[in-house]
Amino acid sequence: MAVKIVSPEPKQVLFKDGKLSLYQTKIDQVTEYKAGQNRAEVESLMSLGFGASGTDLAKNFEIKLQGLDTVDGVRTARLDLTPKQEKVKSSLSHVLLWMDPKRNVSIKQQFFEPSGDYRLTHYTNIKVNGKIADDLFRLKITSRTKIVQPQ
């Protein structure tokens, strides 16, 4: 799984072979985290942004329909997801998803921390089942890029 973030600060996130890599382009640094025993938790969180099926979401989250909203002219179902895993609950209290039921994709996501802070993600120009280039799953680093592996 790969994510390219363009604002407010450009970065790339790659989850591959049980390792999460965060490339911060401004400081030219990759921070690598081994999922190890937390692999299931990492995969459940990453899948929120990558089209997990309803069955997969129900394995990891309590799901409540909060209503219908229109986002960018698209009729969406607003879902409130609460993590089932205690480890996930310690860093994520719940997630709001605005799902397009026709395309089965999330258009907007709001991740809430226990502190009340949140991160809002809004997807535009979504292409379903488009061709994906192989290089999207490689970080665009240089020979000068610093690699950090926190303990």
Task: Give the location of each predicted region.
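Flexible, surface-exposed loop/linker segments and immediately adjacent secondary-structure boundaries
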Residues: D28, A35-R75
